[in-house]
Every structure is written in structure tokens, then in C-alpha cells.
Amino acid sequence: KDIVLPFESANLRIIKKWCSNKLALDRFDPGKLIRTIKKYKINVGTNYMIGFPDETREEIENTINFAKKMKENGLDHSNFYLVMPVPGTPIFEYCTKNGHLPLDYNPDRFQWTKANLKKTEVSAKELEEIRNDAWNTCNHDEFKNMRKSWQVKSA
């Protein structure tokens, strides 16, 4: 049994402005939630989005530190995704109007580990490095090895 919690960000400003789920982390104890779910022998994962157009390095670090705290509460794995706007969403409209989408942007090719936006507070190269470091730091070796086995080999 598995459940993945859509925390998205540890920053209320980011959640309120960009996230569709609007999970209010200030209204409950997420660590307690994870510990409670674990009592029922359910694996718990979380999803985080980083690299919003106006997200600062400090806000990204806050989200990563939050994920580390959740790992201390028994979290089994954390997924870190770089923002990839989907057509029809408010963030896609914003990024289109404000020049954040590269000319070759293709939403049909989901590349969650690649920086998909330009003109962000944190550079594309740094975002990719931060995301990779966060994924490696916040996940157990067993989960990382399992994920590697899922990768499709190209012909």
C-alpha cells in the first residue's frame, strides 16, 4: 500500500500563488500525518515542485529542508519535480504572457528533471543541480535503486 501526499512546497506564498492543490501546511502537522499513516503499514511519499518563475533560492531550500524533516518522521520517499506548465492552467498562461517558456517548449514531453522555464529567479542549471541533490539527499538508497530499475531502456 502506498500514498503520495501533494505537499508541493513548504512555502505558503508559493502554494497560494501557484499550486492548484492549496494544501495548507500551516493548518495541520504534516509530520504527525506521516507518522499516523505509517502506523497502518502504508508507504508514504511526497511530491514537491521547485523552480516557479519567482521562487527564490531560499524558498527552494525551505522546501528541501521541509522534505528532510518529513524523512525524519518516517517518510519513505520524496519526488522533486521542476515546474512544467501544462496548457490550460494559470501558470501556463502566466509563463506564456511573461516570456518564461522557451521557443522549443513542448508540454507533450514531460521532463520533470529538466528546467523547463527561462527567466526564473534561480538559473536553469542551478535548478537542475538543486533538484538532483534534493532527490539524492531526501531518498533512501532502496527507493533510488527501485526507481532506477523502472527506467525504460532506449533501443
Model-derived features: where do they sit?
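A structural motif corresponding to the C-terminal lobe/cap of the Radical SAM core domain
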Residues: 1-153
